UniProtKB/Swiss-Prot annotation:
Its main location: membrane. FAD binds at residues 9-13, 32, 40-41, 61-62. The gene is FMO6P. NADP(+) binds at residues 195-198. This is Putative dimethylaniline monooxygenase [N-oxide-forming] 6.
Length: 539
């Protein structure tokens, strides 16, 4: 008899979990509180309780070739950065083509997950659900939590003296949908993350004045990188990851800062992070420096206090006659249906082996999918997480001992996987695990047996090997070989640049030259000279 797996949430993580369970011969049942798939990307013009919320103008920050399901490329004519409506269309098509909808119970709330009395022997869970006023309990052999971490807003009102006397209105970015209500207003946005910068830039076209208050500032990157290609197609490569990991930190930090300042000098815009050499996760916004240059948007330090009509900043300056304050201050990490002790242990911190498995669990039958964040796309990360979890549930993979998992988790919490308070913001209370993208997905791929064997590829298929190592680390790489091999993976990798330029070549003038792997090879050969030059500069 197949093991039954309960899956919470039908966003991209939940859909990946359903498919991976089916591939491993498991029997999935997914519970989704809304009436459709998509999770975060299912837009609503009003905020819904218990659901993630996005604003009308949201586009992806990862390009289409980097954030697809690994055996399901986007249509050729899709833009490289996708509006939420187009992404939702893709997600629904994926669910339909993979025949996943019949495994989902829509408009069903999960109100509780608890261990069965026989858990120490069976590892089973009781999942309590509610639908149409009726409550039901179901026993599952394993559970995957795929409900995301952008649901419960962190609104740190206690951190801002005088806010209770402020006469204007304030709201969390979760409640922001469009700029119309702020036309002609003076608006303060607190928090410089992707949402905060997006909202501030959008408001700056209709509002009288917009100010962003940030505690530590941030690097700002454009989605458009070298030669006009998407940033992640150029940056997220195995070769680049190799250099970042082997270079001495003072050199890699210096190179990182130089690259971040190529577009504009952050210091001149008030955006230089407090620690200039810190490789802080960047903010993606193509218009922020332009709006600052136009004078419709300004950057200020932290708010010291509020008065009835103004905000006083740490540098003593004021923003007067404020109409609205928008807190883009992240989200609280919370799974209210689950006993919090299950995922917390030492120092009351989130403790998850590889960001997925609670290491102190007597039986490895609970997995959290989609909690880890990295400078890479969410969909392929969630897919690999769900695939590994499904293999563990199906007894195709085994986990290390509890002590080994705890030792690894403690090391990662102190180094690679850092427990951050709010994803990209300094105010939040969420405990999102962050890690280097390629290092992490390669690790998951190794557990599964799906990590591409680069030396073998160079011997057997040099053309493909060059693209895999020097080109973008696209999701198709993890379907080239191993248990989940997809026959279309090789062609998808070799044609990914064609799909990248297809939607932009609306007026063809000449043959487009895509980045050639040998260009990266030449860069690698010139690396010793670069290293020598930088070393001489510092010494």
């Amino acid at each position: 008899m197949s093991k039954r797996v309960g899956i919470i949430g039908a966003g991209v993580s939940g859909l990946a979990a359903i498919w991976c369970c089916l591939e491993e011969g498991l029997e999935p049942t997914c519970f989704e509180r809304s009436d459709d798939v998509g999770g975060l990307w299912k837009f609503s013009d009003h905020t819904e309780e218990g659901r993630a919320s996005i604003y009308q103008s949201v586009f992806t920050n990862s390009s289409k070739e980097m954030m697809c399901f690994p055996d399901f490329p986007y249509p050729d004519d899709y833009p490289n950065y996708i509006h939420h409506s187009k992404l939702q269309e893709y997600i629904k098509t994926y669910a339909q083509k993979k025949d996943l909808l019949r495994y989902i119970q829509f408009e069903t709330l999960v109100s509780g997950i608890k261990k069965c009395p026989s858990f120490l022997v069976t590892g089973q869970w009781v999942v309590v659900t509610e639908k149409d006023g009726k409550q039901e309990s179901t026993i599952f052999d394993a559970v995957m939590i795929c409900s995301g971490h952008h649901v419960y807003p962190n609104l740190p009102t206690d951190s801002f003296p005088g806010l209770d006397q402020f006469r204007g209105n304030y709201l969390h970015s979760r409640d922001y949908k469009n700029p119309e209500a702020f036309k002609g207003k003076r608006v303060l946005v607190i928090g410089l993350g992707n949402s905060g910068s997006d909202i501030a830039v959008e408001l700056s076209r209709l509002a009288t004045q917009v100010i962003i208050s940030t505690r530590s500032a941030s690097w700002v990157m454009s989605r458009v990188w070298d030669d006009g290609y998407p940033w992640d197609m150029m940056y997220v490569t195995r070769f680049a990851s190799f250099l970042r990991n082997v270079l001495p930190s003072f050199i890699s930090d210096w190179l990182y800062v130089q690259k971040m300042n190529t577009w504009f000098k952050h210091e001149n815009y008030g955006l230089m992070p407090l620690n200039g050499s810190l490789r802080k996760e960047p903010v993606f916004n193509d218009e922020l420096p332009s709006r600052i240059l136009c004078g419709t948007l300004s950057i200020k330090p932290s708010v010291k206090e509020f008065t009835e009509t103004s905000a006083v900043f740490e540098d003593g300056t004021m923003f007067e006659a404020i109409d609205s304050v928008i807190f883009a201050t992240g989200y609280d990490y919370s799974y209210p249906f689950l006993d919090e002790t299950i995922m917390k242990s030492r120092n009351n911190e989130v403790t998850l082996f590889k960001g997925i498995f609670p290491p102190l669990m007597e039986k490895p039958t609970l997995a959290v999918i989609g909690l880890v964040q990295s400078l890479g796309a969410a969909i392929p990360t969630a897919d690999l997480q769900a695939w590994w979890a499904a293999k563990v549930f199906a007894n195709s993979c085994t986990l290390p001992t509890t002590n080994e998992m705890m030792d690894d988790t403690d090391e990662k919490m102190g180094k690679k996987l850092k427990c951050m308070f709010s994803s990209f913001f300094m105010f939040g209370q969420s405990q999102t695990l962050q890690t280097d993208y390629i290092t992490y997905v390669d690790e998951l791929g190794s557990f599964i047996g799906a990590k591409p064997n680069i030396p073998w590829l160079f011997l057997t298929d040099p053309r493909l090997a060059l693209e895999v190592y020097f080109g973008p680390c696209s999701p198709y790489q993890f379907r080239l070989m191993g248990p989940g091999k997809w026959d279309g993976a090789r062609n998808a990798i070799l044609t990914q640049w064609n799909r990248t330029v297809k939607p932009t070549r609306t007026r063809v003038v000449s043959e487009v030259q895509r980045p050639h792997p040998f260009y990266n090879l030449l860069k690698m050969l010139s690396f010793p000279l670069l290293l020598l030059a930088v070393t001489l500069t510092f010494y």
